[in-house]
Amino acid sequence: FNWNRQCADCHSTNVQVGLAKGGYETRFDAHNVACEACHGAGLSHTNDTSKPYADVACAPCHSRRSQIAEGFQPPNQLLDYYVPAPTVGPLYFDDGQIRDEVFVYGSFLQSRMHMAGVTCSDCHAPHSARLQSSGDALCLRCHNESPPINFKDALGDFDTSLHHMHPVTPIECIDCHMPKRTYMQIDDRHDHSLRVPRPDLSIQYGTPNACSNCHDQGDEWAMQQIIQYHGSRR
């Protein structure tokens, strides 16, 4: 465990560790995350600013992976430079929820949002990593009764207690759909698979569910509450 192999690739720009010479002779273009870390060198990035590369720019540092080659820059193929960790134990729970520190990209790949074409920058400002909107306003930009034309499946009235089942206690979308785990006592990571709570899977496999993060009546009780509100099939 050292800076050259564990830290430098994501905290510097165009890192060349120099292992081919039998030791460390680390070189880099910038000792921080500069423009070229995501956009590539010089003029080349201005010739293609299309959106499909958005997640590719984020994935190398926001995923649990092993590096197999140096010099990655979009639009290069991610898998030519990195081997992502598989979404299995002990890094993930049996249903795919994050368990260990996996830096969220692996969970996002499991989501319906990813399958529908949502990218990191739809929710996160790429140059600050801040959310594009705060609280539920972020989700309700698409999940409303007049969704963007490219996300028609988001149609619905979700900002109501008939959906979230909590008429009195205020909750946010992420409380149910992006439960968090805390690493190193200070680092909160929200599961980006954006799944619905499944107490039934908790009963079957011992996996966590968002309901039981707040309610202490048990997984069987939580499952019955969901059936009562939404029916046995959704």
Stretches found by the model and what they are:
Residues 3-13:
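N-terminal export/assembly segments and adjacent metallocofactor-ligating motifs
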Residues 1, 14-234:
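Primarily the internal scaffold of c-type cytochrome electron-transfer domains
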